[in-house]
C-alpha cells in the first residue's frame, strides 16, 4: 500500500499532467523506442504513428493518478489492459523497462525533484505488480485449459473466404493437430506475423467469429487503407501458410442465461465479435428475444448477411434490421437492407423494451457513441450496455 505522503505527492502532479497532455506519452514512447528498440517487435507501430496509443497511455496515467486512493475503481481498466497484454505476451521484466522510461520522462520534461520521482516510482511499482499478478493468472488459466498453450502456437490457414469487398475470413487449425482452447463469445485472437519485407514483427488482435468447436478458430479481417497487416493477409496470405497465435483473450464477452434478452448492435467490421455471440445463442437454444441490428455503407461491404439469416432462423425469437447509409441501385433492387441512412433504434423500441435486455455494441467509436446515446434516451440502463473498441480503448 502507498503511504499518505506518496499519494499526496502523486496527486499534486495531476494539473501538470493534464496541462501537458499526450505530449508526455509521446516523449515517453520516443525515449523508450530509442533506448529499447526491441520493443518495436511488440508494440503496434501503426497506433504509434496515428497517436492512438499515446493518447490511450496518457489517459491511463491520468486515471491512475486521479484514482490512486481508490484503486478498485481502476480494476475494470486493469482487466482490459491485462487481457490485451497477454495477447502481446508481456513479461514482468518489461515493466521495469517501462518504469525506467516513465520516470526518466517525468524528470526530463518537468524536472520535478527527487521526492516526486520517488513517489511516482512507488506508485508505478504498485500498479505494475497489479498487472504482473493478473497477467500471470491469465497465462496460467490459458495454459491450463484443455487445448490451451503458453506463448504462441503455430497454426495453419485452412480456409480463406472473401465475405465482402473489404472483409475476408480466415480459418486456422493447429499444426500439431491437437485440440484448441475454448473462449468466450466476443473475445479475440492474437495473430503474430513477420513476413518477408516487414521491418518488425506485427501483432494484431482479431475477434473470433463463431462458437468454439475445439478444432480451430475463425477470424474476419477488414482491409484497411494503409494497413500493413490487413493488406498482407488479404493480398498475400494463402491457405497452407503458417502463422503463430496467442491464446484467445479479452474482457468483452457475452455471458447470459437462456432467458436473458440480448441485442447485438454493430457497424461495419464491428459485427465480428457479434457473430460469435449470435452463433453461441443459436447453438445454445436461446429462448429469449435476440436482436441483430447492423449498419453498413452498402451491400458491397456488408459481410456475413447470409450466415446471420441462417442463424436467426434457428432462434425462436429473433429480430434483424439492417441500415445502409448509401445503398446502391442493386441494393434497392434486391431489397438487401431494411432502412436507409444512419441507425435509428427508436424505430424498433418495442424490440428493446425489456429492462433485462443486455446490449452489446461494436463498431467505430463515433457509431457506438451515437447508438449508446439513443439507447440511454430510450431508458436503457448504462450497466446493460457493453462495448468493444478495436484498437486502444476509448470511453463512450
Swiss-Prot record:
Gene3D superfamilies: Globins (1.10.490.10), Nucleotide-binding domain of ferredoxin-NADP reductase (FNR) module (3.40.50.80), Translation factors (2.40.30.10). It catalyses: 2 nitric oxide + NADPH + 2 O2 = 2 nitrate + NADP(+) + H(+); 2 nitric oxide + NADH + 2 O2 = 2 nitrate + NAD(+) + H(+). Heme b binds at residue 85. Its EC number is 1.14.12.17. One of its GO terms (biological process) is nitric oxide catabolic process. Binds 1 heme b (iron(II)-protoporphyrin IX) group per subunit. Consists of two distinct domains; an N-terminal heme-containing oxygen-binding domain and a C-terminal reductase domain with binding sites for FAD and NAD(P)H. This is Flavohemoprotein. It comes from Salmonella choleraesuis (strain SC-B67). The gene is hmp.
Amino acid at each position: 500500500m502507498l503511504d499518505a505522503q506518496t499519494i499526496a505527492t502523486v496527486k499534486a502532479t495531476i494539473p501538470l499532467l493534464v496541462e501537458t497532455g499526450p505530449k508526455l506519452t509521446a516523449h515517453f514512447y520516443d525515449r523508450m523506442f530509442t533506448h529499447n528498440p526491441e520493443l518495436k517487435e511488440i508494440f503496434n507501430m501503426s497506433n504509434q504513428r496515428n497517436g492512438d496509443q499515446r493518447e490511450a497511455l496518457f489517459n491511463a496515467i491520468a486515471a491512475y493518478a486521479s484514482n490512486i486512493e481508490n484503486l478498485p475503481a481502476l480494476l475494470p481498466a486493469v482487466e482490459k489492459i491485462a487481457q490485451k497484454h497477454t495477447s502481446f505476451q508481456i513479461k514482468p521484466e518489461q515493466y521495469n523497462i517501462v518504469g525506467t522510461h516513465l520516470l526518466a520522462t517525468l524528470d526530463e520534461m518537468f524536472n520535478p525533484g527527487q521526492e516526486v520521482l520517488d513517489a511516482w516510482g512507488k506508485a508505478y511499482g504498485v500498479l505494475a505488480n497489479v498487472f504482473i499478478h493478473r497477467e500471470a493468472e491469465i497465462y496460467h488459466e490459458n495454459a491450463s485449459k484443455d487445448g490451451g498453450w503458453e506463448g504462441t502456437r503455430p497454426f495453419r490457414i485452412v480456409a480463406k473466404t472473401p465475405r465482402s469487398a473489404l472483409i475476408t475470413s480466415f480459418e486456422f487449425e493447429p499444426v500439431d493437430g491437437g485440440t484448441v482452447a475454448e473462449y468466450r463469445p466476443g473475445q479475440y485472437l492474437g495473430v503474430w506475423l513477420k513476413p518477408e519485407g516487414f521491418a518488425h514483427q506485427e501483432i494484431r488482435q482479431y475477434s473470433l467469429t463463431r462458437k468454439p468447436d475445439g478444432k480451430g478458430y475463425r477470424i474476419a479481417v477488414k482491409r484497411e487503407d494503409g494497413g500493413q497487416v490487413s493488406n498482407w493477409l488479404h493480398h498475400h496470405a494463402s491457405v497452407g501458410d503458417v502463422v503463430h497465435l496467442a491464446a484467445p483473450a479479452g474482457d468483452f464477452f457475452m455471458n447470459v442465461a437462456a432467458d436473458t434478452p440480448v441485442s447485438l448492435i454493430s457497424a461495419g467490421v464491428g459485427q465480428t465479435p457479434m457473430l460469435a455471440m449470435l452463433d453461441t445463442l443459436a447453438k445454445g437454444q436461446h429462448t429469449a428475444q435476440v436482436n441483430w441490428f447492423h449498419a453498413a455503407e452498402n451491400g458491397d461491404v456488408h459481410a456475413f448477411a447470409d450466415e446471420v439469416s441462417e442463424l436467426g432462423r434457428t432462434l425462436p425469437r429473433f429480430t434483424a434490421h439492417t441500415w445502409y447509409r448509401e445503398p446502391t441501385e442493386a441494393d434497392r433492387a434486391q431489397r438487401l437492407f431494411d432502412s436507409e441512412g444512419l441507425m435509428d433504434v427508436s424505430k424498433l423500441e418495442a424490440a428493446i423494451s425489456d429492462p433485462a435486455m443486455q446490449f452489446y455494441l461494436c463498431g467505430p467509436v463515433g457509431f457506438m457513441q451515437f447508438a449508446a446515446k439513443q439507447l440511454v434516451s430510450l431508458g436503457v440502463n448504462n450497466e446493460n450496455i457493453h462495448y468493444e473498441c478495436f484498437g486502444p480503448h476509448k470511453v463512450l
